[in-house]
């Protein structure tokens, strides 16, 4: 969701990303390539297929004309200008991790955003994969207050799955889509230092972020790489901890002075009425969302997500959005349209 306005007539559209520019613009737009890539990196591009309710020629199922594709691309210009060169931290999880179609959508969105000059950073968890491996090893998964109880054996599996499997798979997918990703965890370059959560006696090796040192990330994003970060880190003694990925994303966004924090979730966003999906709140400030928590309108698993957003905003992040990760190309809808794809929280 952005506050940019365009003079073009409003349309309802969705993006399908493909490779490269030659299907849309005959590779004559160097400004739409990585500005910081060295000469050895190839040029990236994208085309956009629009599915709209008007004009009738599109509604009939005919392929959009080249002119119409260019029109849709030109409507993205104000949003590209607004966010070009800005850091966007995205937390990836939920249904978007288990559906191949949604996973492909997230990856292509990240590549497109990087191609037009944004600086995306991806933070991920991996609950479904962890649960599957625990089941294969006949280790029961246990949760308390939404947090995974993590003993020493479980912690070893969490690290193995998040860092060794999920992270590297995402890096490979992003690379295959045309960008260059670098896989990291909180351990690398002392990016994150963990500490145990207050109720660690009940939860085991579940941690929270004690410190962030983003110096290892800055040269990566400066040179056009997409960092992909697994949400595990160690304390000062070297003990590994499992950290909530929302928390990691929020703390990284704050440390980097990000323009935007985006949490992909399995809900439409923040609802005025939890029982009514049509009551989505498009935009709300910190004061308003705190009042919703007090009134019980924000409850359950949404509370830690909202608090994560509030904390990041209080530390200088411009906006934080909770968006519907079940929707294909929700990242593009959130950043490249006024409508957005969920709820944007402002300071």
From Swiss-Prot:
Checking InterPro entries in the record gives: AceGlu_kinase-like_sf, AcgluKinase_fam, ArgB, Asp/Glu/Uridylate_kinase, Glu/AcGlu_kinase, NAGK-C
- Binding sites annotated in the UniProt record for N-acetyl-L-glutamate: 126, 148, 242-245
One GO cellular component term of this record is: cytosol
Its recorded reaction(s) are: N-acetyl-L-glutamate + ATP = N-acetyl-L-glutamyl 5-phosphate + ADP
Work out whether the entry's keyword set contains Nucleus. no
**UniProt-annotated binding residues for L-arginine:** 260, 282, 334-337, 342
* Top-level class of the enzyme under EC nomenclature: transferase
- Which Gene Ontology molecular-function terms are recorded? acetylglutamate kinase activity; arginine binding; ATP binding
Kindly tell me the pathway this chain contributes to. Amino-acid biosynthesis; L-arginine biosynthesis; N(2)-acetyl-L-ornithine from L-glutamate: step 2/4
Residue range covered by the transit peptide: 1-50
Q: Which CDD domains does the protein's record reference?
A: AAK_NAGK-C
- According to the UniProt record, list the residues that bear N-acetylthreonine: 51
Which chain regions cross the lipid bilayer? none
Q: Which keywords does this Swiss-Prot/TrEMBL entry list?
A: Acetylation, Amino-acid biosynthesis, Arginine biosynthesis, ATP-binding, Chloroplast, Kinase, Nucleotide-binding, Plastid, Transferase, Transit peptide
**Record localization:** Plastid, Chloroplast stroma
Residues annotated for ATP binding in this entry: 94-95, 265-266, 271, 297-305
Family as reported in the entry's similarity comment: Belongs to the acetylglutamate kinase family. ArgB subfamily.
The record's listing under HAMAP family reads: ArgB
Role this protein plays: Involved in the arginine biosynthetic pathway via the intermediate compound ornithine.
Q: By what name is this protein known?
A: Acetylglutamate kinase, chloroplastic
Q: Name the species this protein comes from.
A: Arabidopsis thaliana (Mouse-ear cress)
């Amino acid at each position: 969701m952005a506050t940019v306005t365009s003079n073009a007539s409003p349309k309802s559209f969705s993006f399908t990303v493909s490779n490269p520019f030659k299907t849309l613009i005959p590779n004559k737009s160097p400004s739409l390539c990585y500005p910081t890539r060295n000469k050895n990196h190839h040029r990236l591009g994208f085309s956009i297929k629009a599915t709209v309710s008007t004009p009738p020629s599109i509604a009939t199922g005919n392929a959009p004309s080249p002119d119409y594709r260019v029109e849709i691309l030109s409507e993205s210009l104000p949003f590209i200008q607004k966010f070009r060169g800005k850091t966007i931290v995205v937390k990836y999880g939920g249904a978007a991790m288990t559906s191949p179609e949604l996973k492909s959508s997230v990856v292509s969105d990240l590549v497109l955003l990087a191609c037009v000059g944004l600086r995306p950073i991806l933070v991920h968890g991996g609950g479904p994969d962890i649960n599957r491996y625990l089941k294969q090893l006949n280790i029961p998964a246990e949760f308390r207050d939404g947090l995974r109880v993590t003993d020493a054996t479980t912690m070893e599996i969490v690290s193995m799955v998040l860092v060794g499997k999920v992270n590297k798979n995402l890096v490979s997918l992003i690379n295959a889509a045309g960008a260059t990703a670098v896989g990291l965890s909180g351990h690398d370059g002392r990016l994150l230092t963990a500490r145990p959560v207050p109720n660690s006696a009940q939860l085991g090796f579940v941690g929270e972020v004690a410190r962030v040192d983003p110096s290892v990330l800055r040269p990566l994003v400066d040179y056009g790489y997409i960092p992909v970060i697994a949400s595990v880190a160690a304390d000062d003694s070297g003990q590994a901890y499992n950290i909530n990925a929302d928390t990691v994303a929020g703390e990284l966004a704050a440390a980097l002075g990000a323009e935007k924090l985006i949490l992909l979730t399995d809900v439409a966003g923040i609802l005025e009425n939890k029982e009514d999906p049509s009551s989505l709140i498009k935009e709300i400030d910190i004061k308003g969302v705190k009042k919703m928590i007090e009134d019980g309108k924000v409850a359950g698993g949404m509370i830690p997500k909202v608090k994560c957003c509030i904390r990041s905003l209080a530390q200088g992040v411009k906006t934080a959005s909770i968006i519907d990760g079940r929707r294909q190309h929700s990242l593009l809808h959130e950043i490249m349209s006024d409508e957005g794809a969920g709820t944007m929280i402002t300071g």
